[in-house]
Curated annotation (Swiss-Prot):
It catalyses: tRNA(His) + L-histidine + ATP = L-histidyl-tRNA(His) + AMP + diphosphate + H(+). GO terms for cellular component: cytoplasm. This is Histidine--tRNA ligase. Belongs to the class-II aminoacyl-tRNA synthetase family.
Length: 430
């Protein structure tokens, strides 16, 4: 049997994980600057959590969910998105309690799972940064979180992103728009795709999100939700736009954008980049004020986004952004002979305890081969350890580029390597 990874998944080897670690470090710093705290939730949850949160007519539920019955007869689903799990954790752990400071600001970095046709930027197991801000409704919250995403992109050096903005209004506005959309689409019912015909009376806003060519042509002239906003929804959206402009964050209004999930209201947004002539969404989110209450929690306004890490890496590669910091190694220990094996192990551990990054040879190879390995690993210093060095206690520490070397003792290295390290670099412009 030939063992292979499942379709739609990827192995992240060390050269790739170095990029991921770099991005994660930058993201963690940005989220921390905005006072967001990390949350970790289970990779699988009750199927009902996701089906109710994302909507029974959503593509996630009807086509993409990985779900199964476990050995206890429970209907379980692998996490297709992060917001529902964060909301469940918020309710279950009573983060709505008055003693908890509001807003509750959470972020996560986690794998998600959707059964989709694998293609560039769309895997069946993919990874997202997500942020959720719960407990306060204020246009400034919406804009702060959009600005946080913008800050992350800028710190990573990503360019060419466009911010698309829309509002779905409050419940009153959405209901008025829903009826207008049904009235518009009904005469075209027989021309719509099968999915859109099914959604027409259940959730007509979902037709706007269709990727089918026949649906796109029909909704092109559909009424816009902006024409059905009540005064409160209009005022809220105007303040969001004013705050974005105050921060000099450029945006365009996309009146047909609805996002792919049912729980949104008011502000929604996407960061989009041109990728090989097509629009690629790398980050999207919005306000979801009814979701906590929908799951029997207290009425809780909330706003958040998800950001695809694989897509971020695709864009960076396209823009020739190098996320890999130069790999260096402080010390490489070249080992000569079996008798040096024990001392090399002790020396390596001693140096690591002193906060130096160390590698050693394990294969008892010729010195030339070991020096080549040190070069490949980017080792700055080399210590050669053989029977003579062990017998006399005297060793040489050599710089791998300048060839400058310092003679010292094994005892001195064990006691404190820092002065020796500094002596090697003294008077050198390296």
């Amino acid at each position: 049997m030939k063992l292979q990874k499942p379709k739609g998944t990827a192995d992240l080897l060390p050269a790739e994980t170095a990029k991921w670690q770099y991005i994660e470090e930058i993201a963690r710093g940005v989220f921390n600057d905005y006072n967001f705290k990390e949350i970790r939730t289970p990779m699988f949850e009750s199927y009902e959590l996701f089906s109710r949160a994302t909507g029974e007519t959503s593509d996630i539920v009807t086509k993409e969910m990985y779900d199964f019955e476990d050995k206890g007869g429970r209907h379980i689903a692998l996490r297709p998105e992060g917001t529902a799990s964060a909301v469940r954790a918020y309710i279950e752990n009573k983060l709505y309690a008055p003693e908890v400071v509001k807003p509750v600001k959470l972020w996560y970095d986690a794998p998600m799972f959707r059964y989709e046709r694998p293609q560039s930027g769309r895997l069946r197991q993919f990874h997202q940064f997500g942020v959720e801000c719960l407990g306060v409704k204020n246009p400034a919250v919406d804009v702060e979180i959009i600005a946080m995403a913008d800050t992350l992109f800028r710190q990573l050096g990503i360019t060419g992103l466009k911010l698309a903005l829309n509002t779905l209004g409050d419940m009153e506005s959405r209901m008025a728009y829903r009826q207008a959309l049904i009235d518009y689409l009904t005469p075209f019912e027989n021309q719509l795709s099968e999915d859109s015909r099914r959604r027409l009376n259940e959730n007509p806003l979902r037709v706007l999100d269709s990727k089918e060519a026949e649906d796109i042509a029909i909704v092109k002239n559909a009424p816009a939700i902006l024409d059905y906003l009540n005064e409160a929804s209009k005022a809220y959206f105007e303040e969001v736009k004013a705050l974005l402009e105050a921060l000099h964050i450029e945006y365009t209004i996309d009146p047909n954008m609805v996002r792919g999930l049912d729980y949104y209201n008011d502000t929604i947004f996407e960061f989009i980049v041109d990728f090989d002539g097509k629009d690629l969404t790398v980050c999207g989110g919005g306000r979801y004020d009814g979701l906590v209450e929908y799951f029997d929690g207290p009425a809780t306004p909330a706003f958040g986004f998800g950001l695809g890490i694989e897509r971020l890496l695709m864009i960076a590669q396209k823009q020739e952004i190098n996320f890999i910091p130069e790999e260096t190694l402080d010390v490489y220990i070249a080992v000569m002979g079996e008798k040096a094996n024990l001392e090399a192990t002790k020396l390596a551990e001693s140096l690591r305890e002193q906060a130096f990054k160390v590698e050693r040879d394990f294969s008892n190879r010729k010195l030339g081969a070991q020096f080549k390995t040190a070069e490949k690993l980017g080792a700055e210093l080399i210590i050669t350890l053989g029977e003579d060095e062990i017998r006399t206690g005297q060793i040489k520490v050599k710089h791998n580029q300048t060839r400058k070397q310092v003679e010292t003792t094994l005892k001195a290295v064990h006691e404190s390597f820092a002065p020796i390290f500094e002596e090697i670099y003294a008077d050198e412009e390296l």
